[in-house]
Structures are given as C-alpha cells and as structure tokens.
C-alpha cells in the first residue's frame, strides 16, 4: 500500500492532502477538499470535510468547539507558518490528524488552533498538547485518550447517549469542570496522570475506574447504579458525594480510596498495603477481604459486615452492623 501526498498551498500555509493508493479491488478515498477564508478576527480558516475522530500530535494548543455547519480549522495568518503544520484527513475512518512538521515543532508550540466539529467520538493526544473545550459537547459516545503529558479541559458539561471513556497513559491530565452525563463511564490511568471531575457525573448504568501506577482519579459528585474501582500500585481515588446502588473496591498494592455518600451494598478488598476510608460512605451491607498487615479498611454499615480479616489487617467500622467475620490474626474495632 503506497502513501501519495499532494501539497496544497493556502495563504502561506502548506497542508498535505493524502490519498491512499489501494489495490485495484478496493476504491481509494478521495483527497479532502480544503478552502480558506478570513474571519472577522483575521484568522485564516480552512474548511474541512466531515470527520468524527481527531488525533493531535506534538505540543499543539487546540481549542475545539462543536457547532453546526461545515467543520473548519482556524489559525493566525502569516508566512512564518509555511510548512509548519501538517493536516491529514483520512476518509476511510473519518480521522483528522494534526501535527507539527519535522523541524517546525517550536513554531507550532505557540500556535493557537481553533477547530470546529459537528460530531466527535474520539480524541487522541500524543505528546504534550493542550486541548480546550470552552463550550459543552453532545455526542453519541466519546473516548478521550491522552498518551504522554498532554491536557484536555472540558469547561462545560459533556453529554453522551452512550459511553464516556477517559484514559490517560503517562503524566497527562483530563478535567471535567462541569461534570457529565452518560450511559456508562470509564476512567483509566496507566502512569502518574490525573482525571478530575467537578460538578455532577450522572451514569445511567455503571462507573468503572482503574488506576495502574501512581495516578489519581477524583469526583466531586457521582450518581450511578454500580461503582467499580480497581487500583494496582500507589494510585488514589476520591469519590466525595456518591450515590450508587452497589460499590466494588479492589486494591492490589499501596493504593488509597476515599469514599463519602451512600450505597446499598459495598465490597472492599485489599490484597496489598492499601487503605480504604469509607467511614462517611453509608452502606447497609458490607463485605470485606483484608490480607496484609499494613492494610486498613474503614467502613460504615447499619446492617451487616461479613468477610475475612487476616494477617494483622485492620478493620475499623461505624454503625449498627452485625458482624459475621472470619478473623485470623486480624484487628477489628468499632470507632
């Protein structure tokens, strides 16, 4: 499969339009049609064909706004931008890619880009790019991946009819300033990155949060059917105001989980030196599994606490719960 490039010179900016030479049995997608115009803000605007996936490479600064009409990319005019930015539009899967050209990375670092989209289902940041959503976004489903030290900031609420997936691989950061609503939520960190959600997160079904490494996931307000938390390493999870029917917490390592709010049924498992503080997390039924001398589980129950506490693991609890515990060299006390 050959990659053919046809450069387009637009107002001093060179954009590479790509088309793939496919075998004769397959039809190659047409090259994207791009035009330019000058807006009232004297920005150079490039009209784009439809896409729903965006990949941003390098240390670009991009502001994304959802609006009706033809999608576009706007940037300040000037001959110094010549050959600085490479734009690819792949018709096969509807992907728009933005990246600095080789040797032009410093030119693009301070280059503000303004991208308008109709529909956005996937956003991928490769490197240290900064992406900002100043307005709310509505979509069927959304997957955001930060691979590196990049940042994604949603200044207004995110609304999806389906799943909302936020993933950080590295030291990057994702911020939901006004919360979100979705069918199901997935937050995943592999590394030292962070995912922070202010406002209210409403999940019709389940919330899954997973940290591998030293990352942090925090929520200001959660409403969901099922809350599932898994930590491997030294990561931290914060759920401040939680309303969930069921809650499952699994810690493999020295991770820490802090919960407050209310749930009907909770299951807490620590198989390392981890720490769970759920004293302010009201629950009727609690099941515990602690097996390490440096691990601590703190919980609240007004009905029953059952399970195993072994090897000098410490269980501290509040409430009127009946205890049905198998204790082997463990520490259990009411506080």
Where are these predicted regions, by residue range?
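Intrinsically disordered, low-complexity segments enriched in Gly and acidic/Ser/Thr residues
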Residues: 259-299
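Acidic (Asp/Glu) and glycine-rich low-complexity loops/linkers
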Residues: 12-13, 22-147, 151-169, 173-190, ...
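Short, exposed beta-strand-loop hairpins at the edges of beta-sheets
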Residues: 313-316
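Extended, low-complexity amphipathic alpha-helical repeat segments
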Residues: 305-307
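Bacterial N-terminal signal peptides that target proteins for export
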Residues: 2-12
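Eukaryotic tandem repeat interaction scaffolds
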Residues: 216-218, 222-276
